Design a protein with these regions (language model features):
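A short, basic/flexible loop-to-alpha-helix module at the beginning of a structural domain
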Residues: 3-22, 113, 156-172
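Phosphate-coordination loops involved in phosphoryl transfer and adenosine-cofactor binding
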Residues: 18-21, 90, 172-175, 231, ...
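N-terminal Rossmann-like FAD-binding beta1-loop-alpha1 element of flavoenzymes
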Residues: 21-46, 185-193
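Conserved hydrophobic helix-helix packing surfaces used for dimerization/oligomerization
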Residues: 22-24, 45, 176, 200, ...
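Residue-level detector of alpha-helix initiation sites
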Residues: 28-30, 53, 182-184, 274, ...
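Glycine-rich FAD pyrophosphate-binding loop
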Residues: 43-59, 201-208
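FAD-site-proximal beta/loop scaffold in flavoenzymes
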Residues: 142-172, 263-312
Length: 312
């Protein structure tokens, strides 16, 4: 267990039970950290997550060379066996607002209401993360062969759990263009290369030194054969002769001011994710983010709190 992620970082043995129950919505980084913290203090913790295994994007989005799956699973095992944390997988929590679709929703076999959890627990913590990719807002993003970062990465890790309705993006022998320079974009480029892409080109609107993932990560990808184009601003995604599938990316060279057309079979827009809690209005999350609350991170519903990416 020495390589396990230490979610229960406060103590080696659990404290005596204090008789209080807490529900955590989401089993990603913030949810598991909250479960470990509360488990150490003697709370009975129930974790609800839509995916088939705990870990969130650590397990279902980030490639294994960055975060090995066995480290996550060992940490979860410790939470469950030693600290009594119960995990309710494949469970989607909703509110009165209509459900919106996100990556991984098809795994859910059970849908429960937030009100139920509030009634059954002394407190609820929403750690549902950021499961919606930002859009560029340029023409052609709806074409076949265009993916967001999550749409590209999620199936690669999820396919082992649901082969019938999840498929890995077909990139073998093709040209893949990745827009963005954060860690997700680096993960996309690395994964495309590992899946056998003939050519991987990274496109960024600033310079390598300004890449959010750091110039070191960019250099690592260049070393394995990826190409890097900087100071490029995407203008539109060009369709093929059928008008249905991507054929190229049209962009502006920020140095020369000229317009360029880069041929592509697959384009991945990886410019960040945004939180999509299904109860945003009901909980008054804008006020929570501004700090206009009675208790730190408590929503407009008594004893319902938020943590992690939901706060961003």
């Amino acid at each position: 267990m020495s390589n396990a992620m230490n979610f229960a970082f406060m103590r080696e043995e659990p404290a005596p039970p204090n008789g209080r129950r807490v529900a955590i919505i989401g089993a990603g980084p913030s949810g598991l950290a909250a479960a470990g913290y509360l488990g150490c203090l003697g709370y009975q913790v129930e974790v609800y997550d839509k995916l088939p295994k705990p870990g969130g994007l650590m397990l279902f989005g980030i490639p294994g060379h960055r975060i090995p799956a066995d480290r996550i699973q060992r940490g979860v095992f410790t939470l469950s066996r030693k600290f009594g944390v119960n995990f309710h997988n494949k469970t989607k929590i909703c509110c009165s607002a209509p459900l919106h679709e996100e990556e991984g929703d098809h795994f859910s076999c059970d849908i429960r209401g937030l009100g139920e959890l509030v009634e059954e627990h002394d407190a609820v913590i929403i750690c549902s993360g950021a499961w919606k990719s930002r859009k560029l807002g340029i023409p052609g993003e709806q074409l076949k062969g265009v993916y967001s970062g999550l749409e590209f990465l999620f199936p690669i890790r999820a396919v082992k759990y649901a082969t019938s309705n999840v498929s890995v993006p077909p990139v073998e022998g093709r040209t893949v263009v990745v827009i963005g320079a954060g860690h997700s974009a680096m993960d996309v480029a690395h994964s495309a290369k590992a899946l056998g892409a003939r050519r991987v080109v990274m496109v960024y609107r600033r310079t390598k030194k300004e890449a959010p993932a750091g110039s070191y990560e960019v250099d690592r990808l260049i070393d394995v054969g990826c190409e890097w184009l900087e100071r490029r601003t995407p203008l539109r995604i060009v369709a093929d002769e059928t008008g249905q599938h991507v054929a190229a990316l049209e962009m502006t060279d920020g140095t020369t001011g000229e317009t360029e057309v880069l041929p592509a079979d697959v384009i991945v827009t990886s410019i960040g994710e945004i939180p999509t809690p299904p109860f945003q209005k009901e909980l008054g999350l804008e006020n929570v983010r501004k700090g206009e609350v009675r208790w730190l991170h408590m929503t407009s519903i008594e004893n319902v709190f938020v943590a992690g990416d939901v706060l961003t």
